[in-house]
């Protein structure tokens, strides 16, 4: 994996080019496509091809794909080809950023992997065995990331010490396993909200021989899912800034999870390069269409459109005026509300199409703003949306959500 910084600004973050293996050059800040079990949620490859024709990177998760390891070990093509996207690169994470990860289950030599089949305790040896079966283009090192803003100093220190032990094995095996010889390892930086612990984690990574890893992944700030949308910038940003000052500029930095648009912009300004679409997914499964504006104007805008709201049942206009996505071009708010009322599968499909299109457009504007050194202007606009007060981008669980047990049935009530 090759990463080149094109421009850098104190107030606007940095623009870069990322090339994974022999793929096309990817522009950073980069948005990874979050997947569930190897598939982009609700969308077939053909439908996703109508959302975008641009080169993408799939963010796959071991906790939703571990059952595929045996067959993948016999697969002689790329991981992207296995999941139906042969032209896309792949990045493998341990945990699903869309779902809150249960706490506990950590031990001296194991990390819990929560799957649909229950909990599996992963040793570093077992983890590398699974990763080598997948042979992704990029993967994260094994880490204890079970920390959040409420974690005690003792829990934080244990997460750092365990991660160091796991990574000693990962660095060694990464160099020796044949199926990982073309893969890039991301070094995890853990330590909760403790600057001393974060410094210790960074120091351990930087002590490794040059070329041992190709980038950083920041873990341990949250436990994924909707709680990540409620992170406090005043707590998070000083820790991230502290970390960024201690790591090499020439390596890319990844921050997974459903972070709010405002927090993403703040992190980009600090120098984080890679994010994912889990926020768009979390909004969709809670019946919310993204409607915040990133094209500066003088009108007031809201963060979401709640398609369960009875007030839109006779609104025969797009979910977002002026949106060019397939859903908004062909369907109305009233129709999407009708799909929710009748539990039709097309409902979440249309929401996912719209939210992904909107979020990818948001990142296009982010890159343009950085190029013009105007990210601060975009940040102020997205934060207020011409409203008297800051807009709330936190995603609260809807009383009616898409039930996991019957995802193929479309919208269903929690009671079902």
Curated annotation (Swiss-Prot):
Binds 1 zinc ion per subunit. Pfam families: TGT. Keywords: Cytoplasm, Metal-binding, tRNA processing, Zinc. The keyword Repeat does not apply. Its cofactor is Zn(2+). Coiled coil: none annotated. This is Queuine tRNA-ribosyltransferase accessory subunit 2. The keyword Cytoplasm applies. Its main location: cytoplasm. Belongs to the queuine tRNA-ribosyltransferase family. QTRT2 subfamily. Non-catalytic subunit of the queuine tRNA-ribosyltransferase (TGT) that catalyzes the base-exchange of a guanine (G) residue with queuine (Q) at position 34 (anticodon wobble position) in tRNAs with GU(N) anticodons (tRNA-Asp, -Asn, -His and -Tyr), resulting in the hypermodified nucleoside queuosine (7-(((4,5-cis-dihydroxy-2-cyclopenten-1-yl)amino)methyl)-7-deazaguanosine). Zn(2+) binds at residues 323, 325, 328, 354. It is found in: Cytoplasm.
């Amino acid at each position: 994996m090759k990463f080149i910084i094109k421009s850098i600004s104190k107030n606007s973050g940095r623009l870069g080019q990322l090339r994974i293996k022999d793929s096309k050059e990817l522009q950073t800040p980069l948005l990874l496509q979050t997947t569930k079990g190897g598939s982009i949620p609700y969308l077939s490859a053909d439908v996703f091809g109508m959302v975008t024709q641009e080169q993408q990177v799939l963010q796959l998760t071991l906790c939703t794909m571990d059952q595929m390891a045996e067959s993948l070990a016999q697969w002689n093509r790329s991981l992207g080809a296995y999941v139906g996207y042969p032209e896309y690169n792949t990045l493998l994470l341990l945990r699903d950023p869309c779902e809150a990860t249960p706490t506990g289950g950590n031990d001296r030599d194991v990390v819990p992997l929560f799957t649909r089949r229950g909990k599996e305790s992963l040793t570093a040896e077992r983890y590398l065995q699974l990763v080598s079966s997948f042979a992704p283009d990029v993967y994260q090192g094994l880490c204890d990331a079970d920390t959040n803003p409420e974690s005690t100093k003792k829990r934080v220190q244990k997460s750092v010490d365990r991660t160091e032990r796991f990574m000693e094995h990962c660095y060694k095996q990464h160099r020796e396993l044949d199926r990982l010889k073309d893969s890039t390892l991301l070094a995890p930086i853990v330590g909760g909200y403790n600057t001393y612990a974060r410094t210790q984690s960074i120091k351990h990574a930087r002590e490794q021989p040059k070329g041992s890893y190709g980038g950083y992944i920041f873990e341990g700030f949250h436990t994924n899912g909707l709680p990540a949308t409620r992170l406090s910038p005043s707590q998070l940003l000083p820790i991230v800034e502290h970390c960024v000052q201690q790591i090499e500029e020439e390596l890319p930095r990844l921050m997974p999870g459903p972070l709010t648009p405002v927090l993403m912009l703040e992190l980009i300004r600090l120098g984080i390069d890679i994010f994912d679409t889990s926020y768009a997914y979390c909004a969709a499964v809670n019946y919310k269409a993204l409607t915040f504006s990133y094209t500066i104007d003088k009108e007031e805008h809201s963060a979401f459109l709640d398609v369960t709201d009875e007030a839109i049942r006779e609104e025969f206009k797009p979910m977002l005026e002026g949106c060019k996505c397939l859903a908004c071009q062909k369907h109305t708010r009233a129709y999407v509300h009708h799909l929710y009322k009748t539990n039709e599968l097309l409902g979440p499909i249309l929401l996912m199409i719209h939210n992904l299109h909107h979020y990818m457009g948001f990142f296009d504007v982010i890159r343009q703003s950085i190029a013009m050194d105007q990210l601060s202007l975009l940040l102020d606009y997205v934060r207020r949306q011409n409203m008297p007060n800051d807009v709330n981008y936190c995603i609260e669980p809807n009383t009616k959500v898409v039930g996991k047990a019957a995802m193929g049935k479309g919208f269903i009530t929690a009671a079902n």
